[in-house]
Amino acid sequence: MEDEIAALVIDNGSGMCKAGFAGDDAPRAVFPSIVGRPRHQGIMVGMGQKDSYVGDEAQSKRGILTLKYPIEHGIVSNWDDMEKIWHHTFYNELRVAPEEHPALLTEAPLNPKSNREKMTQIMFETFNTPAFYVAIQAVLSLYASGRTTGIVLDSGDGVTHTVPIYEGYALPHAILRLNLAGRDLTDYLMKILTERGYNYTTTAEREIVRDIKERLCYVALDFEQEIHTASSSSSLEKSYELPDGQVITIGNERFRAPEALFQPSIVGMETCGIHETTFNSIMKCDVDIRKDLYSNIVMSGGTTMYPGIADRMQKEITALAPSSMKIKIVAPPERKYSVWIGGSILASLSTFQQMWISKQEYDENGPSIVYRKCF
């Protein structure tokens, strides 16, 4: 597909926005889903200070800004800020005219209907998109893994979902949502680093801790054993250089933070871990398809990127499932972007071209057209 008419694929996550052109194998733009506003009145006249900053620019000026994430737990909560993010995506990141390209956007499973309508309305009325489609994130991850049946464990920055999919259709009655994801692990890491005497509190410092988490954390296969190893030797310790040049040492925090995915009680949440949630989701499905789900457990999203997570998942699910069951955890190396990749695949299929909602259909039917065309 030529860039001129290529469809745009935009995956709006709670933490990062991934955007690019259908047919590409990776998103061209990946930036934080952040809108920042100045904390103080600008006093330098003629500095050209803006009233808001988006993405990396907001991130780099975080010292003087208040940062807000318009997507909370995977669902858009602030539409004005969301519009700013889309505007930034089209004009600054991809440098395209939105009225010239069909756009495929993604949504969280169990997204409220009103949100889907609002998204459709903004795309057609604010950005004059010629054609539009909205797809469920987990379904796209499954496509990206080359499957049409399986259960997707999609864990990002704001929310985790387990989504069983059969022959390309998500089974809504069996989708489970867990409000425990990357942002909670970052917060927990901030807390346990404070116990070590390092103090992180501001929104700017939280980003440093997020970086520590992404670089140094991993999932232990046996948590108790790992705690024992960490207390008796320094083999698990790693050092990290802060922006000001100070070097800090981090030990058992490396695996204590991600452990919350399997034991949410350590962050004070009364809920099942990701292994139990996956199991419960499978158990809500028809008994005849469970075998296919157990053998196709697909991980997706940035919070599944910890080293060791697939092995731990295999161990935990094996303990829960019937003993004869074949269990396969699929953790593709590009899973951080698999939702976007699935969108890129879908939007470039010739069979998909009749699925778009056109501007004309929108003008005739209004935003509710989205329920008939996208499911």
UniProtKB/Swiss-Prot annotation:
Q: GO terms for molecular function, please? A: ATP binding; hydrolase activity
Its EC number(s): 3.6.4.-
Where it sits in the cell: the answer is:
Cytoplasm, Cytoskeleton
The answer to whether the entry has keyword Zinc-finger is no
One Pfam annotation, family name? Actin
Q: Which reaction does it catalyse?
A: ATP + H2O = ADP + phosphate + H(+)
**Entry keywords, A to Z:** ATP-binding, Cytoplasm, Cytoskeleton, Hydrolase, Nucleotide-binding
Q: What does this protein do?
A: Actins are highly conserved proteins that are involved in various types of cell motility and are ubiquitously expressed in all eukaryotic cells.
Q: Which family does it belong to?
A: Belongs to the actin family.
Q: What is the protein named?
A: Actin-1
